[in-house]
């Protein structure tokens, strides 16, 4: 895509990528940022991980509990709320309810694009 060309997307036209039985996503990515719809069933755990990408998580429906940093500070984020996760901050999440969130990453998550995000595809809860 030429950097001077706009792009228009419809979420329903983007295939939902199942990662495990209780977790799926849809991705839109550009050169400098990524937008993801993330679908989590109640009880779904995203294991502790970190990445160089800055992250914003906006909860549209449901609620997530995050454990942040080495001290695992707990933050609950509900519908209508946004969590900013700085680059390289270890974090883990659990769906307190069936949840739909939108994640924004800068730069794009290369591991999500190339499928090397094995921490997310595993059933282990670390």
Model-inferred region functions:
Residues 60-61, 78-79, 97:
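A cytosolic small-molecule/anion-sensing beta-strand core signal
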Residues 87-111:
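Ligand-binding loop in jelly-roll beta-barrel domains
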Residues 21, 34-50:
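Conserved short histidine dyad/triad with adjacent acidic residue
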Residues 39-41, 51-66:
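Short, conserved beta-strand element in jelly-roll/cupin
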Residues 36, 45-46, 62-67, 82-83:
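Short beta-strand segments in beta-sandwich/barrel cores
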Residues 1-32, 36, 118-126:
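A short, N-terminal "cap"/entry segment at the start of jelly-roll beta-barrel domains
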Residues 71-87:
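Short acidic-glycine-tyrosine-enriched beta hairpin
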